[in-house]
Amino acid sequence: MQRLQICVYIYLFVLIVAGPVDLSENSEQKENVEKEGLCNACTWRQNTKSSRIEAIKIQILSKLRLETAPNISRDAVRQLLPRAPPLRELIDQYDVQRDDSSDGSLEDDDYHATTETVIAMPAETDLLMQVEGKPKCCFFKFSSKIQYNKVVKAQLWIYLRPVKTPTTVFVQILRLIKPMKDGTRYTGIRSLKLDMNPGTGIWQSIDVKTVLQNWLKQPESNLGIKIKALDENGHDLAVTFPGPGEDGLNPFLEVKVTDTPKRSRRDFGLDCDEHSTESRCRRYPLTVDFEAFGWDWIIAPKRYKANYCSGECEFVFLQKYPHTHLVHQANPRGSAGPCCTPTKMSPINMLYFNGKEQIIYGKIPAMVVDRCGCS
């Protein structure tokens, strides 16, 4: 009997001593599991962020129909950018990304970017344009962005050098044609007279929409144009071939085009901020820096807020389609789990150089994640 009591005391002593140790170990193990879970979540989120950046680079090139990023250096951009009013307005009043998250709508737009403005710089002169032993300005080539869209406006911009005294300037735009029997090589497009005062040079725009439309219908008739801006003394003030200190003063075409309006559809989803403690599917902030890529061919924006989706998806949590949960309940082993994906995206406007060194202003669809959900 005494021996039995001793055994009981020993057993109770072991329980008393071992109990706290066991609880302490369980607590420590739980804490380690939680820390490991947080580390795994951070790693997963970082991988998702990196994948999102790479996907954005691929999407931009694909949506702009570019096989590779245009090889245009920062110095080349400075030389090619016209110092002209229309471009300055685009840059100064640039709307980096539209804030329309409040209406819950999502444009049912095409995959590719839609063009709004094209700034075409003079291209290399064709042999047919060799007149009097030297090339004449200017010859413009047009990409499919102009050819397959409706032209709303077309302006030829020319820069007139400053004058020392008040003078009247006669501006004439001529279109090069195939030589006629009488030797005629040019036919008039537009002419105007304007008064200039001493001071800085000025930009002058001329409407060439009709001419451009004819060129698009009959590409073989596009042999180029000649620009003259003579003052009262017969001096040509038009900058056609920029000299020293005249970078960015080339003539150029500003063409505005329009696309078919797109329909809209309604879409709603969870939108969480970066400070949320929610561990499940949500949106996280992500800023894409084009300069960090070395993409100097993008004029604006230099960076934009793209955002990305990350987090866990349970079968009953914010599923995009109600039948997803029912399918899983019917066959839990045979159905894949829902994924955390964007449920609402919006476009960004972009000003960039294409492969032909033309400046394009357009809209790229589905580049900003506004909301995330499980589907």
Curated annotation (Swiss-Prot):
Question: Which GO biological process categories is it annotated with?
Answer: myoblast migration involved in skeletal muscle regeneration; negative regulation of myoblast proliferation; negative regulation of satellite cell differentiation; negative regulation of skeletal muscle satellite cell proliferation; positive regulation of lamellipodium assembly; positive regulation of macrophage chemotaxis
For this UniProt record, the keywords arranged alphabetically read as follows: Cleavage on pair of basic residues, Cytokine, Disulfide bond, Glycoprotein, Growth factor, Heparin-binding, Secreted, Signal
Subcellular location per the Swiss-Prot or TrEMBL entry = Secreted
One GO term describing the cellular component: extracellular space
- Span of the signal peptide: 1-18
Record's Gene3D superfamilies?
2.60.120.970, Cystine-knot cytokines
The residues that carry sugar chains are: 71
Mention any Pfam family matching this sequence.
TGF_beta
Propeptide residue range(s): 19-266
Disulphide bonds in the chain: 281-340, 309-372, 313-374
Question: SUPFAM superfamilies in the record, alphabetically?
Answer: Cystine-knot cytokines
Give the positions of the site Cleavage.
98-99
SMART domains associated with the record: TGFB
Identify the CDD domains for this entry.
Answer: TGF_beta_GDF8 (cd19388)
What molecular function does GO assign, one term?
Answer: identical protein binding
What does the UniProt record tell us about how this protein is modified after translation? Synthesized as large precursor molecule that undergoes proteolytic cleavage to generate an N-terminal propeptide and a disulfide linked C-terminal dimer, which is the biologically active molecule. The circulating form consists of a latent complex of the C-terminal dimer and other proteins, including its propeptide, which maintain the C-terminal dimer in a latent, inactive state. Ligand activation requires additional cleavage of the prodomain by a tolloid-like metalloproteinase.
Just give the chief location class: secreted
Q: What does this protein do?
A: Acts specifically as a negative regulator of skeletal muscle growth.
Task: Give the quaternary structure.
Answer: Homodimer; disulfide-linked. Interacts with WFIKKN2, leading to inhibit its activity. Interacts with FSTL3.
Q: Which family does it belong to?
A: Belongs to the TGF-beta family.
Q: What is this protein called?
A: Growth/differentiation factor 8
Taxonomy, top ranks, is: Eukaryota, Metazoa, Chordata, Craniata, Vertebrata
